[in-house]
């Protein structure tokens, strides 16, 4: 559904003559803001590539403007491990160069250690949802979870209008949200056998 279709369906389900289009849009925006805080689905995933050409070492990278949450970060096929900020600051004082093994986020920046001088760094992340401005606009959420948006918005509308159907709307929104997340989680695990790994390995 696009924004206009979401609004039309929302207003039909709410079935109130005192809810304007502007109010409906506010409830829909509130719903999207709430959903994005918890839902993590493949259609929200993006990849940012950083080509490193810094003879003196690259100490940090700037995160994409639509960055919401990191999935993984890797360099030359090796995943980086996240460290607490105080440990990273201690490492960075050494100024070591080489393939990065660790990262730390501070505001809109990832700090790296060791500091790479070349190669390619990859960041897989969950992105913010595109804003719905025009009635024809869609985003990753409207395509796969329009019912979650609509019923979450109906919950906000019920609070505003003191509508007794609020609990019903919230309950349906929670069920739909769980279904979408479960479908995404199942798809993530499909196609291979899950194997138990030992916590410790020993070499001869």
Residue ranges and their predicted role:
Residues 1-204:
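Glycine-enriched, solvent-exposed interface loops adjoining structured elements
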């Amino acid at each position: 559904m696009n924004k206009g279709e979401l609004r039309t369906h929302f207003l039909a389900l709410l079935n109130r003559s005192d809810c304007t289009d502007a109010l409906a849009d506010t409830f829909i925006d509130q719903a999207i803001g709430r959903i994005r805080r918890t839902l993590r689905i493949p259609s929200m995933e993006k990849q940012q590539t950083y080509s490193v050409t810094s003879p003196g070492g690259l100490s940090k990278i700037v995160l994409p403007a639509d960055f919401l949450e990191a999935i993984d970060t890797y360099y030359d096929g090796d995943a980086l491990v996240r460290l607490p900020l105080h440990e990273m600051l201690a490492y960075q004082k050494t100024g070591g160069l080489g393939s990065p093994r660790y990262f730390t986020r501070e505001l809109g920046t990832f700090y790296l250690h060791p500091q790479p001088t070349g190669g390619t760094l990859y960041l897989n992340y969950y992105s913010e949802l595109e804003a719905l401005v025009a009635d024809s606009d869609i985003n990753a959420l409207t395509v796969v979870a329009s019912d979650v948006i609509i019923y979450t918005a109906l919950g906000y509308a019920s609070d505003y209008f003191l509508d007794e159907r609020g609990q019903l709307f919230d309950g349906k929104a929670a069920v739909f949200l769980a279904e979408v997340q479960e479908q995404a989680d199942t798809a993530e695990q499909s196609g291979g056998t899950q194997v138990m790994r030992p916590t410790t390995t020993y070499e001869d």
